[in-house]
Amino acid sequence: MYKRQVFGYRTTDVDKNGCDVREDVLARDLKQVRFKYSGSCKVASGLLHDPYTGLNINFVRGRKTSALVQIDHVVALENAWQSGAWKWSHAKRLKFGNDMLNLLAVQGAANQEKGSASAAYWLPSNKSFRCDYVARQIAVKYKYDLSVTNAEKRSMASILHGCSAQKLPNS
């Protein structure tokens, strides 16, 4: 039975820099990043060019504003579970749940719309990002030896057909 917490997301400092993975992703994906205070891991504000929608979003940490920018698992945790993660060790699930290759800062509404959907059922509305998105899904599924349904394969092939010399990301 799928349980999100078995992937350990957000409680882990994978790169041992003292910051949880959410802060690492925000610091990587936002521009004009400002931290709460000097030497802090906590991102106070920044500008996200959302890859899923193409919109620019001003991120400001706060109870009413932080959800505007969320961290998405490109291959959703539930999709990974259904694709083979159910048989992994605890350590491998932690690694997957916190793998920077599989994490992107995105518009909260787009992340909620996507939910646990695979590329067969959801693609970014920003068509110029679809090649990168599908390539990243393939890279993650390949890295972790996750299965791909026939519907996913058709959707991925359809998108990649229009991508000239698309390469798989490795980080």
What are these regions (language model features)?
Residues M1-Y2:
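Short, small-residue-biased leader/transition segments that mark boundaries at the very start
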Residues V6-Y9:
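Short acidic, Pro/Gly- and aromatic-enriched capping/linker segments at domain boundaries
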Residues K16-G18:
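Acidic, glycine-anchored loop motifs typical of Ca2+
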Residues V25-A27:
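Beta-strand-rich, non-transmembrane domain signature
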Residues Y37-G46:
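A charge-rich, low-complexity, intrinsically flexible signal that marks solvent-exposed coils, linkers
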Residues V43, Y52-S171:
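Domain-level detector of nuclease and nuclease-like folds
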